[in-house]
Amino acid sequence: MLSQRLIGRTAVKSAFRPSGLPTVVNASRWRRGYATEADRDLVIIGGGVAGYVAAIKAGQEGMKVTCIEKRGTLGGTCLNVGCIPSKSLLNNSHLYHTILHDTKHRGIEVGDVKLNLGQLMKAKEQSVSGLTKGIEFLFKKNGVEYLKGTGSFEDPHTVKVELNDGGETRVTGKNILIATGSEVTPFPGLEIDEKTIISSTGALSLDHVPKKFLVIGGGIIGLEMASVWSRLGSEVTVVEYLDQIGGPGMDTEISKNIQKILKKQGINFKTGTKVLNGEKTGDGVKINVEAAKGGKPETLEADVVLVAIGRRPYTKGLGLEKIGIELDERGRVIIDQEYRTKIPHIRCVGDATFGPMLAHKAEEEAVAVVEYIKKGYGHVNYGCIPAVMYTFPEVAWVGQSEQDLKKAGIPYRVGTFPFSANSRAKTNLDTEGFVKMLADPETDRLLGIHIIGPNAGEMIAEGTLALEYGASSEDIARTCHAHPTLAEAFKEAAMATYSKAIHF
């Protein structure tokens, strides 16, 4: 039976997957300065996506759980200063830009349109607040103890918690889970003040629209924030060290296409360009750059500079060295395929360890690690972790890119279908982009799926499911898709992969 096969399946061994979880003892928030009497089954340090999902799952499994979070609100970077607030700004800035530039030819004429940046930010904060309160409700529903404070190891079974409202307590556990997430990677010589030199956190809460907005780093975070502020009226320039935007995981053909589209929207790009240094001026910042391969230096000026060169694991102050937990050269907690550190009852998941720093990857690991602790088995397929960039159009992919397959010497065939030939996209007047599929030329098994176009982030779910179950392009092509829908482009791309598309 399928269920039996899934239960027997172990976590995929990949470049990023260690394992393991410990049982934890918890301390009461009211017994400050004293150890608690009762051990917890699981103590979790960190209340971000990995931490809170693990806490809820453990509670559902009947475990006694304590979750420690220093921010004062649950949800971590994703919910408070990442995925969620950025999507609010992306959605509402796109709506504003559409009203300004794209309604007249649709037959909608509007009067004077004004931006109320304060209300835009308020709407973002309301979304965040509602979701964080929702997690607290789920904690109560599932019997999870929530300590607001900073946790650090006192010994392999004891976590000291410095409580946010004063005092300290100690929590002991049979299992301990490190889920402390990540932090912004700083750029040497550029001190972030969240006013003129900002991180992604500052980019989500500016109190004005900068005249000139410069982004260092053309990855997903940089491009999403570039889109927001460009739509709101900034003159935006993106400086990227690599020759393509979107990061190394994005398919090269997709990257070239989204760069052309974003350039048409008014965003300027300097790819293959190295930032040398920078300095604050009276009312802005000067950034010195040159070609990555060497060349004549150039000075760029901006009112605000966003540093978006990536993130790094956050393990500072945990006291890992005190108990002998090892980190690799990039600061990631070293784990095995069951998420265990060298101390078997202490495990780590999410951004603090190996793999892509994605909230949904952390969520999958959180469920798996609790299953390993409680049942002895768990599963995450690291070959089926989708990625989405929420620009307009959106970009989404899962599986291998064309450059991945070429580098590995794996044969493949390609099928594509443009949204310009899709009836729903044409009625929506949003026809930029295409669906691209890569499949094994002999077995027809899908190897990778890449989408640039409207609602790509929603459509990639079908691709992820297809890869998870080992589907062929013909499997997709012979599956009925409703008409007229954007998803028909997915079906047509599959038809083009194993045979020929009908509508192109």
UniProtKB/Swiss-Prot annotation:
List positions binding NAD(+). Answer: 217-224, 240, 275, 310
Give a GO biological-process term: 2-oxoglutarate metabolic process
For this protein, what does the record note about how its cofactor is bound?
Binds 1 FAD per subunit.
> Where found?
Mitochondrion
Disulfide pairs? 78-83
Q: Name one GO molecular function term.
A: dihydrolipoyl dehydrogenase (NADH) activity
Q: Which cofactor does it need?
A: FAD
Q: Which reaction does it catalyse?
A: N(6)-[(R)-dihydrolipoyl]-L-lysyl-[protein] + NAD(+) = N(6)-[(R)-lipoyl]-L-lysyl-[protein] + NADH + H(+)
Which residues are listed for FAD binding in this entry?
69-78, 87, 151, 180-182, 351, 357-360
Q: Which UniProt keywords apply?
A: Disulfide bond, FAD, Flavoprotein, Mitochondrion, NAD, Nucleotide-binding, Oxidoreductase, Redox-active center, Transit peptide
Transit peptide span, please give it: 1-34
One GO cellular-component annotation of the UniProt record comes to: oxoglutarate dehydrogenase complex
- Main localization is mitochondrion
- Gene3D superfamilies associated with the record: 3.30.390.30, FAD/NAD(P)-binding domain
Q: Which NCBIfam families match?
A: lipoamide_DH (TIGR01350)
- Family of this protein: Belongs to the class-I pyridine nucleotide-disulfide oxidoreductase family.
| Subunit-structure text | Eukaryotic pyruvate dehydrogenase (PDH) complexes are organized as a core consisting of the oligomeric dihydrolipoamide acetyl-transferase (E2), around which are arranged multiple copies of pyruvate dehydrogenase (E1), dihydrolipoamide dehydrogenase (E3) and protein X (E3BP) bound by non-covalent bonds. The Chaetomium thermophilum PDH complex contains 60 E2 units, 12 E3BP units, about 20 E1 units, and 12 or more E3 units. The units are organized in 1 E2 60-mer, 4 E3BP trimers, about 20 E1 tetramers, and a maximum of 12 E3 dimers.
Additional notes on this entry:
The active site is a redox-active disulfide bond.
What's the protein here called? Dihydrolipoamide dehydrogenase
What organism does this protein naturally occur in? Answer: Chaetomium thermophilum (strain DSM 1495 / CBS 144.50 / IMI 039719) (Thermochaetoides thermophila)
Q: What is the lineage of its organism?
A: Eukaryota, Fungi, Dikarya, Ascomycota, Pezizomycotina
